[in-house]
Amino acid sequence: MPDVDPSILPQESLAPMPTARLVDGLVPPTNRWFSGLVFGAEPLPVFPVPLAFGATAGGFAFGLPDVQVTEQSILGPFVPQVGVDVGASSVVVTAYDTASVTLDLLDGAGSVLGAVTLVEGSPVLRYTAATDQTAELTVAFAETGGLVSAEAGGREFVLVGSGDALSGGGRSLDLAEGDSAAWFPVPDDAPDGAVATLAEAAAHPVTGTTLAYGVADDAVTTAITYETGDDPSGAATVVVRLPHQRESEGATCGLGTYATVRGTADVCTASTLAWTSPAVEPAGKLDVTALGEDEKTELADQVRADASALEPRPSDTYFGGKALARDANLLALAEQLGLDDVAVPLRDDLAAALREWAEPSGCAERDARCFVDDPEVRSVVGRTPSFGSDELNDHHFHYGYFLYAAGVVAADDPALAADLAPVLDLLAADVASGAGGEDFPALRVFDAYAGHSWASGYAPFADGNNQESASEAVSAWNGLALWARASGDATLEAQARWLLSAEAASARAYWTDFDREDPAIEGFGHTVTSLVWGGKRDWATWFSAEPSAMLGILVLPMQPVAGYLAGDPERIRANLDEALAGPREDPASWDVMFGDQLLMYAALAGPDDAAAALKIARSLPAERIDDGNTRSYLLAWLQVHAAA
């Protein structure tokens, strides 16, 4: 990530940051799986997969969610199964990293009683006492067959590390300062000897995690190392492998499974969990040069019509950025078709608009089309908020459109790239700072273990954080890659390619193309999940109950990179059949919200599907063309895919 300086922007907090249970010196961890534990009047449950965790009046409680499936939802809420009371009055987060968070439990005077470490990908929860104390348990643990365990919520939990400290009929732990206790739930279908193996590995509880990634032509690699304190390097602990991580190496699995809201998870031992995802190539131009003359003529006429009908762009960061990206796509078509009378003024207009947004002092002079630096929450925020962007919601969606437009328009214009860089680099750092620092957290929105981003800034929800439009997240990283290329930053481009490919894999694994035969989600009645939370997945959106919205929000904005959504043609058709108002063959069926986006998605099922969609697109009602799209781009997409 290039050096950035937030102080070049006006300093302003557009909305107050909620109460934060955070030690001084830590950058506020917005957009994290654990943000609800940090922000707000009271700590909310969080979901360090596969566990669920909540702070309680005297300490904490945790459990393994019992996944329940309905027609509309896959539910895995926080239900306390094991509780630990140490007389705590409050909690405060003292550290966080790639996949772990550590919180101190404090007494009424603010003194530390002990610390809990929560780790994504680990079923082991560890508590370390900071004083001599007795921890009261809500269930009685006892030794059976060489293991100390208890039944809770229909599940057996194993206690590791402090079995000899049990007292009070197994409901108390007498801990000395520095003593640790760890618990894990026994997996389903654990073979003989597996629980003993897991207990031995759980004796090496995780103290922190680190991230490494690699980018190759055909795949990207994500590797999370689970550090175990003073243990020798490489000591294995218990890890959990989710469906998107199946192409993994370095883990010993076959130790049982857990049902999670994301599907069946494999229980393994490893010191590093590494997996690959198919590489997705960044793309900023839909290549129409190979189209026939008739198609080019039709397209040229439509480009002229759309260019002449452009209206002033909105001034907020979502719709304003989306309009810039839309017009960048129109510019790319006009230039390929040799329409200089359209392309030259449109390029000038886009360059001027981008320069206006990128004026560092813009918000000192106007109330729109500019950015400020919020020094309290450490974020760059658009002066005209939308969808809660002043509360850190959806920044990657919004800023991805700006980065995309800048990457396209400045691709062959170094002077423009240089003018935009001070502010565009800040937008990039806000959502994707690689290392983190005093100004921004590392990878603010992206969860490396989950393989996808989180959209809510403060996550004030009992079901954890969430993300709806996984496709806009993918598009954001595509935009980041294009901007990195245009600004000559090879390191940032490599990081963006990793983010792009990883998010695309998880988007398919949990939003659009998940395994419908996975027994963990048996009974779910839909082909997509349009809202993925820490503790559930829903066939629902924030804005509409229309079936077309459920799929449309998972495919827009259908940028040139959207080919990652292709795969099984029958799955694409099944997803569409659920979303449309009638048979795919009937043009009226596409007269729905996001009808244009669904037509473009249909083209990914094959050339015949694209040709059929093209016929319908020509007469699709104008109000069904999304505000981030034009009929020109819609037709061009379908023409290109029909000719493939």
Q: What is each model feature region?
A:
Residues V344-D348, A418-V423, A494:
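Short sequence/structural elements of tandem HEAT/ARM alpha-solenoid repeats
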Residues P314-A334, S389-A428, S469-W477:
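Aromatic-rich carbohydrate-recognition surfaces in CAZymes
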Residues D425-V532:
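A compositional/structural signature marking long, glycine- and acidic/polar-rich segments
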